[in-house]
Amino acid sequence: MQEKKFIYAVIENNGESPPFVESRTGGIDAAPLETVCYRDLAAVVSAIDASRFDPDLSGEASSAQKEESLKADLLKYQQVNFFLLEQSRRSGMLPLRFGLTARDKEEVEGVLERVYIQLRTYLDRLKGKVELVVQASWDLPKILQEIAGDNPELMGADRVQTGRMLFEAAEVRREKFAAAIHDKLSPFARDFSEGPRKAEAMILNRSYLVEREKEPLFDEGMDFLGTKYEGHLSFRYIGPLPAYSFVNIELTQ
């Protein structure tokens, strides 16, 4: 079987044994994790079949089988990166995009050398920080009914115009909710990144870059918001995660 290297993340090369050596944490297909070093950086990699993530070499597996395999690989990628996040609390870790591969260790080292300054800058920026994801949703039909009840004058127009005005009023209310949530949480964060609102009921999908020391304050802020908007908004709070939303490095394979 011809192999290549799957690249998970970049961590500090401080001359010590990598955090996964004693735990024997494995990567995709339980392959041993290893590091490829360049100067003070170390890429965490594992060996995979060269046909993986290559549609031209993926064989005769059905689309359903390929999808299941991809989901399993993504889950393992996330598990490895979360492990690295927890084991690199002080030195930090830089997650790289899912599916990044290289022919061999030499090519991995070449990637580290080519974008060293970017990687070093990102790793320094993310040191001691995690990503926390905040999603807020509401019952849109209920909100529209409330708006109509509070503004009976809107019901005097024709149905098309009434519908348009109701949704415009709902958007104003959504923006106020989102602003209030952000005002409460942003003092505890170093940065934030807007995510797509994946459903009509979702009013906010935002990732925050938070120092570990301030994570308890962020948690308290979420508790406050949950109590304040109980019965009006439902929240989904995800994290801590590696700072996926705050890394934007273009690495060609």
Q: Model-flagged regions — what are they?
A:
Residues M1-R236, P240-Q253:
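An interfacial alpha-helical scaffold signature
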